[in-house]
Curated annotation (Swiss-Prot):
Bias kind Low complexity: ranges: 42-53
Organism: Homo sapiens (Human)
DNA-binding region: 219-278
Keywords assigned: Developmental protein, Differentiation, DNA-binding, Homeobox, LIM domain, Metal-binding, Neurogenesis, Nucleus, Repeat, Transcription, Transcription regulation, Zinc
Domain of life: Eukaryota
LIM zinc-binding domain ranges (all copies): 70-122, 131-184
Annotated region described as Disordered, given as residue ranges: 19-53, 203-224, 273-297
Name this polypeptide is given: LIM/homeobox protein Lhx6
Source lineage: Eukaryota, Metazoa, Chordata, Craniata, Vertebrata
GO biological process: cell maturation; cerebral cortex GABAergic interneuron migration; cerebral cortex radially oriented cell migration; cerebral cortex tangential migration; forebrain neuron development; neuron differentiation; regulation of transcription by RNA polymerase II
Molecular-function GO term, any one: sequence-specific double-stranded DNA binding
Length: 363
């Protein structure tokens, strides 16, 4: 913060009269002005007790040896009160900030620098200490870190490359007011050495790792995992319709709490997997209505031999779903995988003639 310069406290005193009651004393840190009693001598720039004059009596009135000329308007001061700052005098109405033109008659303090008068806010804004990183003002209540005569906010004292805030006692490098942690400072040195070995001209600023160079590569997108209840709803819908429309997708999204896009991708991946593991069947006659489910899956659903109420919760799925399904970008997990059940040839029903293996999964 700027050190106090030539100046003193700004107070108000009368030209002549008896001792008045005390006013509020100002609080200035640097370059404050003092308003003293005008008796032809300049008082030292030290805090003085401000006072208010009482009207002078005719008997005690003594004509002044010289005229009091206002430093602002240049006119003689004939008012009862005047303001005196750093051996200069003003009309009460003429003392104002040279930047914002705010009258200082009601202020407790003012600041003077190079014969210019400033209010407290404009003085510290122009001459106060500023952060070397962000350029904002550093106030007396702020915690700071200092390096090579520069002051930094705690949050601003961070590595230019990786943006990591440095701690007390940690090693760092300072390159053209850019703070670097030890790792990126060593990287800068390596860049300079490599450029010198290759004969390439590289400036110091160009050797500093940029923010883009320090950004880590984006991690792989996290796979979506489903709960048992979500899988149960989607698998039941897949058994009925493996290509649901937008309205059905929205219903599934409301039931499962997933987004429509995630559910749509799950159905797409499962259709592709089912198509991959399902053997090709002859094309039905043109007169027959097309079925949205493969014939093998339709037969398994309509002619499943497990019809007891306890096993009604089990859905017959063909080999397109395993215990852990890797469906493209969607990671599907089933809570439990029942062992495969081999249907014997002597069982009744259409499946007994085919002799196929049906894998049952419980969810």
């Amino acid at each position: 913060m700027a050190q106090p310069g030539s100046g003193c406290k700004a107070t108000t005193r009368c030209l002549e009269g008896t001792a008045p009651p005390a006013m509020a004393q100002s609080d200035a840190e640097a370059l404050a002005g003092a308003l003293d009693k005008d008796e032809g001598q300049a008082s030292p720039c030290t805090p003085s007790t401000p006072s208010v004059c009482s009207p002078p009596s005719a008997a005690s009135s003594v004509p002044s040896a010289g005229k009091n000329i206002c430093s602002s308007c240049g006119l003689e001061i004939l008012d009862r009160y005047l303001l005196k700052v750093n051996n200069l005098i003003w009309h009460v109405r003429c003392l104002e900030c040279s930047v914002c033109r705010t009258s200082l008659r009601q202020q407790n303090s003012c600041y003077i620098k190079n014969k210019e008068i400033f209010c407290k806010m404009d003085y510290f804004s122009r001459f106060g200490t500023k952060c070397a990183r962000c350029g904002r003002q550093i106030y007396a209540s702020d915690w700071v870190r200092r390096a090579r005569g520069n002051a930094y906010h705690l949050a601003c004292f961070a590595c230019f490359s990786c943006k990591r805030q440095l701690s007390t006692g940690e090693e760092f490098g300072l390159v053209e007011e850019k703070v670097l942690c030890r790792i990126h400072y060593d990287t800068m040195i390596e860049n300079l050495k490599r450029a010198a070995e290759n004969g390439n001209g590289l400036t110091l600023e160009g050797a500093v790792p940029s923010e883009q160079d320090s950004q880590p590569k984006p991690a792989k997108r996290a796979r979506t995992s489903f709960t048992a209840e979500q899988l149960q709803v989607m698998q039941a819908q897949f058994a009925q319709d493996n290509n649901p429309d937008a309205q059905t997708l929205q219903k599934l999204a409301d039931m499962t709490g997933l987004s429509r896009r995630v559910i749509q991708v799950w159905f797409q991946n499962c259709r592709a997997r089912h198509k991959k593991h399902t053997p090709q069947h002859p094309v039905p006659p043109s007169g027959a209505p097309p079925s949205r489910l493969p014939s093998a899956l339709s037969d398994d659903i309509h002619y499943t031999p497990f019809s007891s109420p306890e096993r009604a919760r089990m859905v017959t799925l063909h080999g397109y779903i395993e215990s852990q399904v890797q469906c493209g970008q969607v990671h599907c997990r089933l809570p439990y995988t029942a062992p495969p059940v081999h249907l014997k040839a002597d069982m009744d029903g259409p499946l007994s003639n085919r002799g196929e293996k049906v894998i049952l999964f419980q969810y």
